């Protein structure tokens, strides 16, 4: 149960002077590790994520267990490799044998109040209330999730709490690639002069396995970018970064609620993502492939005994 062990280790390292700290786990969907301004990316501005990272420990070499939402989340909340327990594709049901061993259940059994808001995707989009150890405090929607979490944080808790805030964005880049409307408000069409440049590894890799090109060709609804021009890809990257900024603003509301309720002294905050996005590298959108942009994920914890980053 490697993820659970890692999660426990992160919490204990941040909380050596805190007995039974509160735990807040915030994670996004499809956010690559370079998609933060504090990662040195000049194409976006993420003051709230930067604020968390500056106060904590940033793990530069964090990788997801699987480059797809359902399997990655399965690993997060069970601690098992997805293929080992039948969670290898989106829509795979959680095995009954694991329901009593999930992260929420284990932490609840340790004496915590456990709450979950936002996207679940194992396989239902929302976590069933009172299952997997969690009270469901909000539906699968980025709109209103921060407010629901802020309300939860304002309560007078008799026990330490474990709060999960699971955001959908920047996953809405999938809708952009398919020319569909965004669920949480559209992004303005930019002038091409305002768009980021192409990545250094924009060209397709001639040594890629045939299965990668086959996946691209045979799943047009997932990878509708075969006809994208370089300008289209630049606009894709612009839109992706605006979606990251959108979710950064929402996460800022949760950070403000932590401030208002004076929770920093006895609270550990962990931030991560389930996987990244191709963002045009190798002319790839979405996930699934084992490209660095897709498997290298955000991971950091706050607060930290001192500001630092580690390559672990």
Predicted features and spans:
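Loop/turn elements at helix/coil->beta-strand transitions in domains of secreted/extracellular proteins
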Residues: 20-22, 57-60, 110-113, 158-161, ...
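Catalytic-site neighborhoods of secreted/periplasmic enzymes
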Residues: 74-187
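Sec-dependent signal peptide recognition
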Residues: 1-7
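Generic enzyme active-site microenvironment
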Residues: 27, 117, 272
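Active-site-proximal cap/lid insertion segments
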Residues: 18, 33-35, 39-41, 155-159, ...
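Hydrophobic h-region of N-terminal signal peptides that target proteins for export
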Residues: 8-16
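Alpha-helical packing segments of well-folded alpha/beta enzyme cores
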Residues: 27, 48, 103, 145-149, ...
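Active-site-proximal N-terminal segment of extracellular/periplasmic enzymes that hydrolyze or transfer
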Residues: 18-57, 66-67, 176
């Amino acid at each position: 149960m490697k993820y659970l062990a890692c999660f426990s280790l992160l919490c204990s390292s941040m909380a050596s002077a805190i007995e039974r700290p509160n735990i807040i786990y915030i994670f996004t969907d499809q956010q690559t590790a370079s998609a933060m301004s504090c990662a040195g990316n000049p194409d976006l501005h993420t003051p709230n994520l930067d604020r968390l990272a500056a106060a904590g420990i940033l793990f530069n070499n964090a990788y997801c267990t699987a480059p797809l939402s359902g399997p990655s989340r399965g690993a997060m909340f069970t601690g098992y490799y997805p293929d080992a327990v039948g969670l290898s594709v989106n829509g795979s049901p959680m095995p009954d044998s694991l329901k009593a061993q999930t992260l929420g259940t284990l932490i609840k059994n340790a004496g915590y109040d456990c709450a979950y808001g936002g996207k679940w995707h194992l396989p239902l989009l929302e976590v069933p209330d009172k299952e997997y150890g969690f009270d469901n405090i909000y539906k699968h929607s980025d709109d209103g999730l921060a407010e629901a979490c802020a309300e939860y944080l304002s309560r007078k808790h008799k026990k330490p709490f474990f709060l999960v805030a699971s955001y959908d964005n920047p996953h809405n880049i999938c809708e952009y690639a398919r020319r569909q409307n965004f669920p949480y408000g559209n992004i303005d069409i930019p002038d091409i002069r305002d768009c980021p440049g192409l990545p250094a590894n924009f060209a397709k890799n001639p040594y890629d396995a045939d299965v990668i090109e086959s996946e691209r060709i045979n799943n047009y609804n997932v990878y509708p970018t075969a006809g994208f021009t370089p300008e289209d890809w630049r606009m894709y990257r612009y839109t992706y970064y605006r979606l990251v900024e959108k979710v950064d603003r929402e996460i800022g509301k949760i950070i403000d609620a932590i401030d208002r309720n004076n929770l920093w002294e006895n609270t550990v905050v962990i931030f991560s993502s389930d996987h990244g996005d191709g963002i045009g590298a190798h002319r790839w959108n979405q996930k699934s492939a084992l490209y660095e942009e897709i498997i290298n994920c955000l991971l950091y914890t706050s607060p930290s005994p001192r500001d630092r980053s580690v390559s672990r």
